Amino acid sequence: MKKIIVIGAGIAGLAAAIRLRAKGHDVLVIEQANGPGGKLREAKQDQFRFDLGPSLFTLPELVKEVLSEGNLSPSSFPYEQLDRSCHYFWEDGTELIAYHDKDKLAEEIDKKIGINASDKTNSEDVLTHLKHSAFLYDYTAELFMHRSLHKFKSYLSKPVLKALFKVHRFDLGKSLHEANKARFKDPKLVQLFDRYATYNGSDPYRAPGVLNIIPHLEHNIGTFFPKEGMYQITKSIYERAKALGVEFKFNTSCKQIVVKGNQVQGVELDTEFIPADLVVSNADVFPTYRNLLKNQKAPEKTLQSEPSSSAIIFYWGVKGSFPKLHLHNILFSDDYQGEFKALFDGDQLHPDPTVYINITSKLKKDDAPKGHENWFVMINAPANSGQDWDKWIPQARENILNKIQRTLGTDLRDKIIVEDILDPTLIEKRTSSHMGALYGTSSNNRMAAFLRHPNFSQNLKGLYFCGGSVHPGGGIPLCLLSAKILDELITNA
């Protein structure tokens, strides 16, 4: 059995530590923050509780799988399936609830969006699209989500070979927007399904059409909510790791990954050197090379790839109750293409942003005092390249409040009694995410999946990677899968 050091206690690092410890390895996790979770943490202020990071929970079986690793009984992890994925709002007064039940969804679409002039109704277009999304998932998930793209034998499996005969249906030659525009007659539905590019911080007008795999997770499989909030994912996995004997060092920064020849030797901290047979970096791949492997050859093409979008998040304790809203809510921009041009071409904020509002107190009542709600309010932002955020954030706040007033008919200004803010510079500072990018690199390239850093070093023996900046990508499910891929690579090495 080997001595393994994991750098970073984000969700992928925790999952990797559990899987490797369950194989009998000695595992030490080193984390610069004062606790586990990375972006998936919580904060409390004046009787309000906020999940600070990822707010959408899909594929809960991936969490349950991690919590079943090792020779202990599976850990308890209560969660519920939701009857809807999101409430959508447009400024013209259109409101749409995306029900999980397909019959209710079809009825809602035809009632709220209306009947189009073609032979098919809008709901038929959506249901056909969701079947296509399921098709994409069935034929591409095995390779793009569950296997290393950087090992030749991954391409020799039966599911992958089978997928090659269907590749002409993957919309690889179209952008996500082009694929959706060809499928839907109504521009609101195009916009709704274009939104899924933002799930990995990308631009739907440039990202490949194969990203239409994403709606399958939300609409066909379903959306879920942990009974104790999203931070319960971190807490449960962390407690499982400790129970299995994983060791942790918090408030500890790594100075460098020590290499001799082409073999990893361990990790140097401020005060000591810790030897290891293997090192796993759950840190962002950019600072891993620039800060921890300064004397080693870096994969410059990967490191110079376009970063994903970042975010500005306002955590608001709000007085009052808002029945129109649910757990997940989207207020769409009237200029969606302009919003993405500003983000990716201009490195700027758009004056009419799409606003995402997450309110966990809708389901977890003790997240806010009686008569109040906890609002997690997010807009997409460009990655940090030195913009004047101190100037931009007050402008963004005002744009968001104006958007809420125009779309929901509510002036929130005198109802906000608690406020905290997260911006790209703070994201970068707290999580070492390069430029504050939420998902590492964007998918604004038809070959983006193949340009992500692999889960292993191609030059250094004993060095592995997991987390949102490497294959298969960002977000809770893909981070958990990166840990699974890494575990299989180490086991089969």
Mark where each language-model region is.
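N-terminal Rossmann-like FAD-binding beta1-loop-alpha1 element of flavoenzymes
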Residues: 3-29
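Glycine-rich FAD pyrophosphate-binding loop
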Residues: 22-45
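N-terminal FAD cofactor-binding segment of flavoenzymes
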Residues: 43, 50-85
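Rossmann-like flavin
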Residues: 92-207
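A glycine-rich dinucleotide-binding beta-alpha-beta segment and adjacent secondary-structure elements
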Residues: 186-200, 352-356, 410-472
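Helical element adjacent to the flavin cofactor pocket in flavoenzyme catalytic cores
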Residues: 213-264
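Mid-domain catalytic core of redox enzymes
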Residues: 255-369
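C-terminal segments that line or cap access tunnels to active or ligand-binding sites in enzymes
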Residues: 319-428
